């Protein structure tokens, strides 16, 4: 039986967090046996905001090494850097011609980023979702792991693919959102009503995958709980979001049920919960960081992974691009 094709990626801007790991990267690793997986470092998306060129190159290597340290296996998955597969931008341009201005102007992420980067509202930022559609449609992906912030972009991808298929006959697979069964949503440490984000300006909200263990413990000691007296360790997202976030985090790392954690911390102070959460996070990160350091030091191996991944991705992408070019009247 043919495995479903899945594609996902992360920008090499800002260090990947425990939220990225528990909410996405762990699922990427788990899917490698059941799916045909393509995982890319989306550096072309990163340049919609100004980047230091050398820092961006280093960040691409950092992100690639982190993928591998988390368990992404280049023998099982196609792992590549987006800009090393030129078919992404080639298809992106073609799809621009089948996307309406009104559709893009409704994208909430464009509105948010325009406010954040008011001095650099460029066409690339506006057309970002079309390149994302090309990323997905190039490989005929069936399933796309998406967070809440990317759902709207996936809907646009489906609309573009359907429009093209209606005009030229079956060309693109219509991708479905993939919602993992056991995906953990890690919230901000200081503001547990919002998701932990690697682009958060307040670094006390975030724990990076390469964070120093002492810094991890310090941040978790400062994590928001509540002012209940006496303290009550109970999972209640509506009334106790901070405590619930710490319980969810521990459960996601240790595999313990929320109920057993509630029983374990019954009658204890919030400091006990924070300390235990810190130890769980550090215990998860230390072996990952060790693998990362070894991989990041081996530039020849990273180059080999990039080269093999790009070759594989290009061969697959070219099949779709050729089909599209033929249908729209370009010489191939």
UniProtKB/Swiss-Prot annotation:
Taxonomic superkingdom: Bacteria
Binding site for ATP: 11-13, 19-20, 147-149, 186, 195-199
Principal EC category: ligase
One BP annotation, GO: tryptophanyl-tRNA aminoacylation
Keyword vocabulary terms for this entry: Aminoacyl-tRNA synthetase, ATP-binding, Cytoplasm, Ligase, Nucleotide-binding, Protein biosynthesis
Short motif 'HIGH' region, span: 12-20
EC code: 6.1.1.2
Cellular localization per UniProt: Cytoplasm
Short sequence motif 'KMSKS' region: positions: 195-199
Cellular component, GO annotation: cytosol
Subunit structure: Homodimer.
Matching PANTHER family: TRYPTOPHAN--TRNA LIGASE, MITOCHONDRIAL
Family: Belongs to the class-I aminoacyl-tRNA synthetase family.
Function noted in UniProt: Catalyzes the attachment of tryptophan to tRNA(Trp).
Designated name of the protein: Tryptophan--tRNA ligase
Organism: Shewanella oneidensis (strain ATCC 700550 / JCM 31522 / CIP 106686 / LMG 19005 / NCIMB 14063 / MR-1)
Gene expressing this chain: trpS
């Amino acid at each position: 039986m043919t495995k479903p094709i899945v594609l996902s990626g992360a920008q090499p801007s800002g260090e990947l967090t425990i939220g990225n790991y528990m909410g996405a990267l762990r699922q990427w690793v788990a899917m490698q046996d059941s799916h045909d997986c393509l995982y890319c470092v989306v550096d072309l998306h990163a340049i919609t905001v100004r980047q230091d060129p050398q820092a961006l190159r280093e960040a691409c290597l950092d992100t690639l090494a982190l993928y591998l340290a988390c368990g992404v296996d280049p023998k099982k998955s196609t792992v590549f850097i987006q800009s090393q597969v030129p078919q992404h931008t080639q298809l992106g341009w073609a799809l621009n011609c089948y996307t309406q201005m009104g559709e893009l102007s409704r994208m909430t992420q464009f509105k948010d980023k325009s406010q954040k980067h008011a001095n650099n509202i460029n066409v690339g930022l506006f057309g970002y979702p079309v390149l994302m559609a090309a990323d997905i449609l190039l490989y005929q992906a069936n399933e796309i792991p998406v967070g809440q912030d990317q759902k709207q972009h996936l809907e646009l991808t489906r609309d573009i693919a359907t429009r093209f298929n209606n005009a030229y006959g079956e060309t693109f697979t219509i991708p479905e959102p993939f919602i993992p069964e056991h995906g953990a949503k890690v919230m901000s440490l200081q503001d547990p009503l919002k998701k932990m984000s690697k682009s958060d300006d307040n670094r006390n909200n975030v724990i990076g995958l390469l964070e120093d263990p002492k810094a991890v413990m310090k941040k978790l000691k400062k994590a928001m709980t509540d002012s209940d007296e006496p303290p009550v360790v109970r999972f209640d997202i509506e009334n106790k979001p901070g405590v619930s976030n710490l319980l969810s985090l521990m459960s996601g790392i240790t595999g313990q049920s929320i109920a057993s954690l509630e029983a374990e911390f019954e009658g204890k102070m919030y400091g006990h919960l924070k300390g235990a959460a810190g130890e769980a996070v550090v215990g998860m990160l230390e072996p990952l960081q060790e693998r990362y350091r070894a991989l990041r030091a081996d530039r020849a191996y990273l180059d080999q992974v990039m080269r093999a991944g790009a070759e594989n991705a290009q061969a697959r992408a070219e099949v779709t691009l050729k089909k599209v070019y033929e249908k729209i009247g370009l010489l191939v």
